[in-house]
Amino acid sequence: MPIITLPDGSEKNYESSVTIEKIATDIGPGLAKAALAGRVNGNLLDTCIPITNDAEIQIITSKDNEGLEIIRHSFAHLLGHAVKQLYPEAKMAIGPVIEDGFYYDISYKDTFTPVDLEKIEKRIKELINKDYDVDVEVVSPAKATQVFSERGEVFKLDIIKNIPKDEIIKLYKHEEYIDMCRGPHVPNTRHLRAFKLMKVSGAYWRGDSNNEMLQRIYGTAWKNSKELKEYINRIEEAEKRDHRKLGKKLSLFHFQEEAPGMIFWHPNGWTIYRVLQDFIRETISKYDYQELKSPQIVCRSLWEKSGHWDKFKEDMFTTTSENKEYAIKPMNCPCHVQVFNQGLKSYRDLPIRLSEFGSCHRNEPSGALHGLMRVRNFVQDDGHIFCTNEQIQEEVQSFIDLVFEVYKAFGFNSILIKLSTRPEKRVGSDDVWDKSEKALSDALDSKGLDWSLLPGEGAFYGPKIEFSLKDCLNRVWQCGTIQVDFSMPERLNSSYIDVDGKKQPPVMLHRAILGSFERFIGILIENYSGNLPIWLCPLQIVVMGITDRNNDACLDTKSKLIKYGFRASVDTRNEKVGFKIREHTMQRIPFLIIIGDKEEENNEISVRTREGKDLGKMTLDKFKVIMDESISKKSLVESK
């Protein structure tokens, strides 16, 4: 006789086992129609699974975050249903939920084409319109093995092999199609409406290149057609802003097969890089960082001492010299510890803040490489703070100020903050963890910031704070981090003399603001669609004449602009001025200066912006004031 407690505290008594479907019906027909699943004593459950004991329950609908995930997972099974009807020889592998949608990995003899996707999408819509119930059966691994053996689903059998014999498996039945999943799933296809199949790509079974290459069909699904349309619009806008396309169009960088994951920076792109680096260098100097430079290639022995060799060697590029094995550094931290270790340190010397624009190499899988966002060679705006336990909070507070100062300069005002705390397997005493976690949370609270807690998500060697940016398309990019480390200083024999004259290992704070220069530049390019803030633009001004006889005045103006410290060029081509304006506007040049006979006569210039605004005629001195103000204030253009 289960007693069911609802979210408002009210109770319902039942004579025998009861389902979420029944409870929702008893509450009201509207809720019964909207119910997707239930949260029972904290666990999600299908609407048809019996509840036999007392329970606290919440009815899940599409309005809940869990509801959207259930819809997406159910769409993955519906995709499988459609594929098996159209291509009976296909073998189904896995179909999980991902950000904004779902995918299904499929083995099939022919390559799926855009025409195939259209056919599959059409069949999915037909299945939805049949408005059928999705049935659930709870079985043993042995029974599941029998079911999928009869169907020849080899990938399902491979999954079942690794499931303990005493566990249960849920089989979800879409008419004649059977799939397995933890669930829950929607009770009826009427809940599945707003979706679109997006693309097909390749993926190895279990991510192992020694296994079969499968075809991965991606889809997106939403609560309603309005949200779907908004998402499709965002995707289309993101494609227009793709930093790889703009990088080529604006001649910023390129990649080629001879150096996968390594960037060929063009002069324009390298200018952005250097300006960004100079800005970070200037900003962190106000926070008393000391910049250093550490070796690019370091002997295996140091990586063994630091613990990276055991955990990271597969991702390292290695080489040998004089019978010794070396690694190109994948991170900078062990090298920074070596700098700290030079000479005796007192508690009076702490904190010591070291920084480096450290070039790192990681042997990322070729399939994971993605423009500037995922590369094999990148430069971190890396920093390490050596301090005492008592100094952690103050150092974190200072870093928070630094992070927000930098992000504000680039127009990022929506910052998501997460605090990750101790995992089950960790080093250090509970007392040390208590103090360090409190130091981080107190630092965040002292700044009046909203933040979320991720229990158990910290590294084994200390808690951390992550800072993520939200761009103009509401995409979230994790960039900044500050990580407490109790382990590495001890592993690498770091110490300072405390107030009692005893040796103590310092606390090490790993911190980065941008993450990597390459990825951050990619984020900026996409956020601004190439229309970078004036101070960051590789070329800020182009001067052009209306006729050839104005060329000397243009060249003279360009020379003065360069002397003022601006990045300027001159266009003396024998082309119509309208053509030049259009071309340089397409190149995202912030200011275009036009000089004709009247401008020469009056010692003036005409100025246009890349947004098409005519600023009219003015003296060069007045234009210099506009430029100086824009650059000094780090003026931003609207992200459009």
Curated annotation (Swiss-Prot):
One of its GO terms (molecular function) is tRNA binding. Its EC number is 6.1.1.3. It is an enzyme of class 6 (ligase). InterPro entries: aa-tRNA-synt_IIb, aa-tRNA-synth_II, aa-tRNA-synth_II/BPL/LPL, Anticodon-bd, Anticodon-bd_dom_sf, Beta-grasp_dom_sf, TGS, TGS-like. CDD domains: TGS_ThrRS, ThrRS_anticodon, ThrRS_core. Zn(2+) binds at residues 333, 384, 510. Residues 242-533 are annotated as: Catalytic. Its main location: cytoplasm. It holds the Pfam family HGTP_anticodon. It catalyses: tRNA(Thr) + L-threonine + ATP = L-threonyl-tRNA(Thr) + AMP + diphosphate + H(+). Binds 1 zinc ion per subunit. Residues 1-61 form the TGS domain. GO terms for cellular component: cytosol. It is found in: Cytoplasm. It comes from the Bacteria. One of its GO terms (biological process) is threonyl-tRNA aminoacylation. SUPFAM superfamilies: Class II aaRS ABD-related, Class II aaRS and biotin synthetases, TGS-like, ThrRS/AlaRS common domain. Its cofactor is Zn(2+). Keywords: Aminoacyl-tRNA synthetase, ATP-binding, Cytoplasm, Ligase, Metal-binding, Nucleotide-binding, Protein biosynthesis, RNA-binding, tRNA-binding, Zinc. HAMAP family: Thr_tRNA_synth (MF_00184). Homodimer. Belongs to the class-II aminoacyl-tRNA synthetase family. Catalyzes the attachment of threonine to tRNA(Thr) in a two-step reaction: L-threonine is first activated by ATP to form Thr-AMP and then transferred to the acceptor end of tRNA(Thr). Also edits incorrectly charged L-seryl-tRNA(Thr). This is Threonine--tRNA ligase. It comes from Prochlorococcus marinus (strain NATL1A). The lineage of its organism: Bacteria, Bacillati, Cyanobacteriota, Cyanophyceae, Synechococcales.
